[in-house]
Amino acid sequence: PSVRRRRERQSCIRDRLCLVEALPLLLAKYSADAPRLADLLAVVPHMRLEVYHETRNMEAFESLWDDVCAHFMRHVHPVLLQRAARAIQLLATAPMAAHTTTSRLATLKESVLSLLQDTLYQRQVDTTVFSEDDVHNLQASLARVYTLLKAMDASALLDDDEPLWQHMLALAMRGRLQYDQEKTFVHYALSSLALYLLWRTKRAIDDDTELVSRRDEVLQMIHMFLERGSHVQATVLHVALILHTLFFTVRDDLRILCPEEIQTRCATQFSTELQTLVPLYRAQGKSIALLDTDMHISMLASAYVAALRVGALGVQHAAAILTYYGHFHSDFDRMCHEAVEVMRDDAMHSDRAWAVCETILEALKGSMQLYFQYKDTEPRLVSLARQLANATMIRGPGFSVVRAIDANAMVTLHVATVQQFVQYVRDGGHEGHEAKLFKALVHLVGTLHPSDALKIHATMQQRLAAAHVEPEQGNKAWDPYFAYEKRLLNVAAKDAHLLHTAQPT
């Protein structure tokens, strides 16, 4: 075994040395083939860069730096840019590059920004009309800025350069014009501003007035977009969520609260985005296009749940994501579980049981609307109800309930849901599917006391009678209602002297 391991090590060393020699040749050979070049750049993170130092071949290391930077500046293929930026980040942090990193990054900064500055030279960015070539140049430049900021702390690109910062703000503000051809570079500008603030905050010093000023400028613009709309609303929402999450959790002198009005707009925009994606997701099936949709959903949902978890968004806004439980991929459902945990923590530990119950009702209403629309989502409605039940209790061994949500809040939730059913019946147009709501509600009976169950049952009878709604025995459409009623009476029966006061319909 020791001989085999020694041979494997020797083989690995030979491979590394061969790679040092072969990679520059391959990069030169395929310099015009962006997809192939992107594959080659993906090799760099798996290289042991110390080999250059160990073999005293720093000339080859410097040459690799030049090659990667050259390809980063020559191409605009998104995957190639991402992999080139990752390679630059690794080369910049290699120990043997310490004496050249600063100068090389400064040169790269100048190269990245020169095309941007040339395009914007002596122009009023907020009012000028960009040609097709201008749009292409801006998109390429901002894509490089964004990709670098995503891969490493490249905030020096915008530090101490107020004119450039103002240009970036102005380019992002062009989202208000809603020109289709400018959509991509507006997205890059907004995302770059957000990433800059993330990196700048990470290394912030006390009383960083420039950071506070720039943060406020970006948030003011984002809030304006949330109010008035733009053609990059998904990007606006994502930036709003990550910035408010960041600045809700930092030290006190930088901390800001997300206004309730902005929270509501974020929740509304998030729900609108998911509502738009549901039919697209259903149509794509298992196609390749589904992967991009999955990534987009995950990006927005993860930012949204993070904002809920830290408290930047109030628990009442969890309904916006929970409504769509079961309608997307499994990662989305796991993020819904995170939202349910936030609700449970609030219900049990923050005396916010009423808000949690209101959120449960809103989530059920949203899921019912999807059921009315598509007719095949009943299992998703029921699965959602099972998850929401976890927000109302803390379980112990053997599924025992160790702690439960406030009883009065739960009674109000059940009564309000019954009233929602009555409203569905009054509105009509649901083809007799209204009672499916009880198929979800039955899963929220677990924490009720006998007296609470009896109170809900009595109130339900009164509400139905007042609305002249009479459940029909033998009609399968009413089965969920009778199952719910039976469950209430079974809970009430746990207190023997209450049993005789209620009879099934």
Task: Describe each model-derived feature in a short phrase.
Residues 2-15:
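Single conserved hydrophobic/aromatic residue that forms the stacking wall/gate
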Residues 302, 306-316, 320-348:
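C-terminal, active-site-flanking charged/polar segments
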Residues 1, 16-29, 57-77, 104-128, ...:
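Amphipathic alpha-helical segments within extended alpha-helical solenoids and repeat-rich scaffolds
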Residues 44-48, 87-95, 141-153, 189-200, ...:
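Hydrophobic residues within the alpha-helices of tandem HEAT/HEAT-like
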Residues 479-482, 490-505:
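Polybasic, low-complexity terminal segments and linkers that are predominantly intrinsically disordered
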Residues 127, 132-140, 144-256:
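Long, acidic/serine-threonine-rich intrinsically disordered regions with weak helical/coil propensity
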Residues 249-252, 272, 276-287, 292-310, ...:
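Extended alpha-helical scaffolding segments
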